């Protein structure tokens, strides 16, 4: 699976910028780069930087800072040369074209990371974390990916694997020497399987929370028609995302908008106003609104302070809820006692929105990862394979209770190890690797 050629690509995003980076990796990275650079790259020590000019066939291309990282002390485990040139499209693209003319090959998406994996610099779990780091759009998603890239998830998986291997080795001894009549009901292999199950179960149980943290906390704006839900959504996000009119029932479907508040990602969900209606389309919208309220993690219950107080749905008392008295610029809200926070706002003037943001921030901080080293699963691939591990370990444990032959228990444990191998990459197929790394950007 290892490639012996030398690859190159632009490692920075396209478009205008102060600096662009061109990366070269492979056995001929130094010799190819040396032919287009004014300095002596072949003579440079590893992990040093040198300023010079890039040219080809005596034609000047750009000034660049060259970084040399010799194998195996590099990201890919191969010789790497990086050219830091002026930003924009033309300088870096001309450097790439020159490197291609000198014998390098254009890198495939994720090929640098794939080489790092194939050369043992990172495992597959860490490699996948690279793409998660790049794609993270909020602080929680970034920290989850950071923990994964630092190897915390891999360490937990390795612990599961070690426990299974220890149990399997003991069981195989029992299978090879059945005449010893060793008692296994409360023996070492059973205890090791139970330990492995405990770690696996903890990882699996983190998936839903990990998904929520990575994708954002869902908060639905709900209330009667014309209470100002859509106006508040637009005011918070500073976008004209939702249609606003004086006609009740304008919003008839779920409208979702991502909103980052102090680095925390929220999914604000605008919903249809709740009321009795015979309009089939609006009725469907109301049904979806109620479903959104049941699925959301928090509710902003919007009330028009100038109108009679509506009845509060039971679900408001079952979830984190903030009561928003809208239109406080024209009327003072009534004084009522409810078990959730009340904030007076005006979607029209912006009054009270700062207090609302502070309240949301305070609530979100209760779910903030901070510097916690807790591991969260966010990959569906990881969850599926770990679920397979859990199933196999459960079957193996039941094998003791049902007094199954040791060979049957060993078979379940080997299957669990196979799933772990697919997870870490030690037994993964080339097709799976291709699918994973093809989602990466070129140059990473």
Swiss-Prot record:
Co-factor(s): K(+)
Domain of life: Bacteria
GO MF entry, a single one: metal ion binding
BP terms from Gene Ontology: tRNA methylation; tRNA wobble uridine modification
Annotated binding of Mg(2+), by residue: 230, 251
InterPro entries on file: G_TrmE, GTP-bd, GTP-bd_TrmE_N, GTPase_MnmE, MnmE_dom2, MnmE_helical, P-loop_NTPase, Small_GTP-bd
Compartment(s) where it occurs, according to its Swiss-Prot or TrEMBL record: Cytoplasm
Keywords of this entry: Cytoplasm, GTP-binding, Hydrolase, Magnesium, Metal-binding, Nucleotide-binding, Potassium, tRNA processing
Record: residues binding GTP: 226-231, 245-251, 270-273
Enzyme Commission number(s) from the entry: 3.6.-.-
Residue stretches making up the TrmE-type G domain: 216-365
Family matches, as PROSITE patterns: G_TRME
Binding site for K(+): 226, 245, 247, 250
CC cofactor note: Binds 1 potassium ion per subunit.
Pfam family, one: MnmE_helical
Residues that hold (6S)-5-formyl-5,6,7,8-tetrahydrofolate according to the record: 23, 82, 121, 444
Keyword rRNA processing appears in the UniProt entry: no
Gene Ontology cellular component list: cytosol
Purpose of the protein: Exhibits a very high intrinsic GTPase hydrolysis rate. Involved in the addition of a carboxymethylaminomethyl (cmnm) group at the wobble position (U34) of certain tRNAs, forming tRNA-cmnm(5)s(2)U34.
HAMAP family the record matches: GTPase_MnmE (MF_00379)
Similarity comment text for this entry: Belongs to the TRAFAC class TrmE-Era-EngA-EngB-Septin-like GTPase superfamily. TrmE GTPase family.
Assembly with partners or alone: Homodimer. Heterotetramer of two MnmE and two MnmG subunits.
Protein name: tRNA modification GTPase MnmE
The organism of origin for this protein: Chlamydia trachomatis serovar A (strain ATCC VR-571B / DSM 19440 / HAR-13)
């Amino acid at each position: 699976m290892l490639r012996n050629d030398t690859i190159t690509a632009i490692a920075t995003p396209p478009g205008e910028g102060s600096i662009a980076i061109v990366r070269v990796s492979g056995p001929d990275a130094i010799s190819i780069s040396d032919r287009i650079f004014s300095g002596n790259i072949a003579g440079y020590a590893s992990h040093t930087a040198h300023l010079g000019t890039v040219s080809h066939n005596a034609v000047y291309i750009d000034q660049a800072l060259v970084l040399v990282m010799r194998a195996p002390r590099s990201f890919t485990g191969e010789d790497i040369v990086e050219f830091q040139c002026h930003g924009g499209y033309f300088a870096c693209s001309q450097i790439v074209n020159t490197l291609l003319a000198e014998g390098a090959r254009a890198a495939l998406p994720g090929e640098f990371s794939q080489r790092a994996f194939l050369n043992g610099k990172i495992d597959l779990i860490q490699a996948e974390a690279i793409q998660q780091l790049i794609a993270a759009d909020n602080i929680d998603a970034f920290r989850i990916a950071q923990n994964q890239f630092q190897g915390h998830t891999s360490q937990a998986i390795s612990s599961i694997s070690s426990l299974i291997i220890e149990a399997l080795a003991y069981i195989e001894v029992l299978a090879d020497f059945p005449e010893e009549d060793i008692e296994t009901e409360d023996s070492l292999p059973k205890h090791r399987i139970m330990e492995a199950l405990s770690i696996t179960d903890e990882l699996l149980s983190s998936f839903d929370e990990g998904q929520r943290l990575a994708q954002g906390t869902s908060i639905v704006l709900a209330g009667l028609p014309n209470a100002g839900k859509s106006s508040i959504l637009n005011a918070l996000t500073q976008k004209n995302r939702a249609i606003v009119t004086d006609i009740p029932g304008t919003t008839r479907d779920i409208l979702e908008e991502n909103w980052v508040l102090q680095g925390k990602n929220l999914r604000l969900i605008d919903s249809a106003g709740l009321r009795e209606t015979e309009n089939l389309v609006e009725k469907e919208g109301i049904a979806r609104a109620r479903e959104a309220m049941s699925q959301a993690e928090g509710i902003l219950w919007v009330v028009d302070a100038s109108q009679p107080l509506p009845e509060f749905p039971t679900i408001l008392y079952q979830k984190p809820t903030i009561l928003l008295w809208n239109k406080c610029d024209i009327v003072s809200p009534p004084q009522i006692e409810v078990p959730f926070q009340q904030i007076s706002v005006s979607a029209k003037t912006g009054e009270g929105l700062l207090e609302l943001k502070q309240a949301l921030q305070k609530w979100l901080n209760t779910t903030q990862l901070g510097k916690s080293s807790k591991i969260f699963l966010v990959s569906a691939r990881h969850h599926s394979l770990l679920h397979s591990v859990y199933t196999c370990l459960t079957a193996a444990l039941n094998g003791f209770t049902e007094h199954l032959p040791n060979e049957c228990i060993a078979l379940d444990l080997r299957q669990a190890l196979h799933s772990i191998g697919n997870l870490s990459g030690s037994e993964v197929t080339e097709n799976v690797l291709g699918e994973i790394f093809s989602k990466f950007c070129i140059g990473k």
